[in-house]
Amino acid sequence: MSNSIVIQTSSTVIEDMKQQYKHSLSPKTPQGGIFMAKVPSCTITAYKSGKVMFQGGRAEAEAARWQTVSQTPKTAVKKSVDSHRYAPPASIGTMSIVGSDEVGTGDFFGPMTVVAVYVDAKQIPLLKELGVKDSKNLNDEQITAIAKQLLHVVPYSSLVLHNEKYNELFDKGNNQGKLKALLHNKAITNLLAKIAPTKPEGVLIDQFTQPDTYYKYLAKQKQVQRENVYFATKGESVHLAVAAASILARYSFVKQFDELSKKAGMPLPKGAGKQVDIAAAKLIQKLGKERLPEFVKLHFANTEKAFRLLK
């Protein structure tokens, strides 16, 4: 029997949901709707009124992932994602900062990696000389070359959430936004302990959700970093600490990805496009469906598409 659950939430959470389900979005949106997404055994429809409907066999489980962050006021002023009390000061680019960033969240294959890096203000010219900039503008070869030098120059904390653990935590009701928040907080906490008694002038997180939502995700954590913590989208262009974190996170991700390809005995593509569906179908044929959780993020729509290719 098909279940149907409706929750009332904020526009911020709905934006988070849309980002979370971006690989499963339906081209059709009902009247008054913001988006419709179809994941295995559940259809999610978000409306401009703030209501979100979950329909299907997994409606209850899927809705539960969002109910913990949905208790926010119904009325919200529409503003820029960077318009909040956690915005960094104008002078942050010249300060001694811990920066954090993540890689792998949009890839079906491979883990999620988060890195926090401490950059002393005196090191900024050196990092520029090494070619540190937004990792999206660098190829894997350049990433490797710069990362190998960075590892000996800056203190850092690197965390890898492997696929099996990722899927296990996701099945327990943790959406991707929450997993990112947990890893960022942990990497920053680890790094602050590592560099003590040195205290950075601030912490800059490459913003992936509204700061208030980030802290809601961390509500049950014993240690949460709040002192001089700032959030900014495109953090790599705000401070080189985030750019360095992005490079080290991608370096770690590429290494993990190569290991995963060796384990699979076949090259695995990055991203979440059609080539990924084909590779996943081949992997299922080769190793069996029970091994799939070791390689992929199961909640992506690619899982269903891969199985469809095998029919």
Swiss-Prot record:
GO terms for cellular component: cytoplasm; ribonuclease H2 complex. CDD domains: RNase_HII_bacteria_HIII_like (cd06590), RNAse_HIII_N (cd14796). Its cofactor is Mn(2+); Mg(2+). It catalyses: Endonucleolytic cleavage to 5'-phosphomonoester. Its EC number is 3.1.26.4. It is found in: Cytoplasm. A divalent metal cation binds at residues 101-102, 206. Keywords: Cytoplasm, Endonuclease, Hydrolase, Magnesium, Metal-binding, Nuclease. It comes from Bacillus cereus (strain ATCC 10987 / NRS 248). HAMAP family: RNase_HIII (MF_00053). Manganese or magnesium. Binds 1 divalent metal ion per monomer in the absence of substrate. May bind a second metal ion after substrate binding. Residues 95-311 form the RNase H type-2 domain. Pfam families: DUF3378, RNase_HII. The keyword Cytoplasm applies. PROSITE patterns: RNASE_H_2. This is Ribonuclease HIII. Endonuclease that specifically degrades the RNA of RNA-DNA hybrids. The keyword Ligase does not apply. GO terms for molecular function: magnesium ion binding; RNA binding; RNA-DNA hybrid ribonuclease activity. GO terms for biological process: DNA replication, removal of RNA primer; mismatch repair. Belongs to the RNase HII family. RnhC subfamily.
